[in-house]
Structure formats: C-alpha cells, structure tokens
Amino acid sequence: MMKKIDVKILDPRVGKEFPLPTYATSGSAGLDLRACLDDAVELAPGDTTLVPTGLAIHIADPSLAAMMLPRSGLGHKHGIVLGNLVGLIDSDYQGQLMISVWNRGQDNFTIQPGERIAQMIFVPVVQAEFNLVEDFDATDRGEGGFGHSGRQ
C-alpha cells in the first residue's frame, strides 16, 4: 500500500546534488535519509551531533507516524547509531527532519555531505484513551517484570 505524504524541500541541493529519499528495493521498509551538510563532519568516539536532512514532512494523518532508525551497516561496522535511538515524527510535525547521530564506536567517523545516515519508516498509530480501574482482571503473568517469562 502506498500512502502520499507531503514533503517540502528546504535545501535546494536536495533532489539535485542529494537524491530524494527512495526505497532501495520493492521490498524495502525504510527510505534512506541523507546528511544535508555543507562540509564533512567528524565525530569522535562518544560524540553526538544533529544532522539536517534538508527536508520537512507533514504526515497529516493521526493514524500514522514516522520513525527514524539507524542504518544497520553503520551501526554494526562503525558504531554509528541515532543519539535518541529512535526518532519519532508525529503526524502534525512540519519542521525539518533532523537526525541525532551518535558515535558509540572506538574510532573517529566522518559524515560526508549527501551520505545516507538513517532510514525512515511509516507506522500505524493507535491513540488510546485511558480507562481508570482499581484492579485488573487476573492473568498468568500478573505483575511479573523484566526476565519474568524466562530465557528459553
């Protein structure tokens, strides 16, 4: 299923020097987001930075949200992940998409202008209304927390 999402180009290089986000294959879940930088940015181990994408989106449908996720190769090979682990884009947000990048690796890492540094997926959202109760109906698990269901 393809859903139309409004996108605004904030930097004129996007769509020319830096390709618009696209799905790499027909089965891809995520769109690659690129670093819309003037110059390369070097991240030392432990450093974080906010990287602009040059794009703004307006989802406009409260039953959808976008999530920004790390690219698996950058995380596994270089220790480059998102500083907030997952970026959540609400349906009514209209500002620039910014990517919080964290170097959790052991070596310096350089982000090049136009480099693919994150991916964005669209996910369904259910807004819940809380129903206040005194007690819950009993379940097998009950209040068992972390590790309660075992390892095997």
Curated annotation (Swiss-Prot):
InterPro entries with a match to the protein in the record: dUTPase (IPR008181), dUTPase-like (IPR029054), dUTPase-like_sf (IPR036157), dUTPase_trimeric (IPR033704)
Coiled coil residues, start to end: none
Enzyme class: hydrolase
Reaction equations catalysed: dUTP + H2O = dUMP + diphosphate + H(+)
Transmembrane spans: none
Entry cofactors: Mg(2+)
Matching Pfam families: dUTPase
Keywords on record: Hydrolase, Magnesium, Metal-binding, Nucleotide metabolism
Residue sites binding substrate per the record: 71-73, 84, 88-90, 98
Highest taxon of the lineage: Bacteria
Record-listed E.C. numbers: 3.6.1.23
Record flagged with keyword Hydrolase: yes
GO function terms (MF aspect): dUTP diphosphatase activity; magnesium ion binding
Example GO BP: dUTP catabolic process
Pathway as given in its UniProt record: Pyrimidine metabolism; dUMP biosynthesis; dUMP from dCTP (dUTP route): step 2/2
The protein's assembly and partners: Homotrimer.
UniProt similarity note: Belongs to the dUTPase family.
Role according to the record: This enzyme is involved in nucleotide metabolism: it produces dUMP, the immediate precursor of thymidine nucleotides and it decreases the intracellular concentration of dUTP so that uracil cannot be incorporated into DNA.
Protein name: Deoxyuridine 5'-triphosphate nucleotidohydrolase
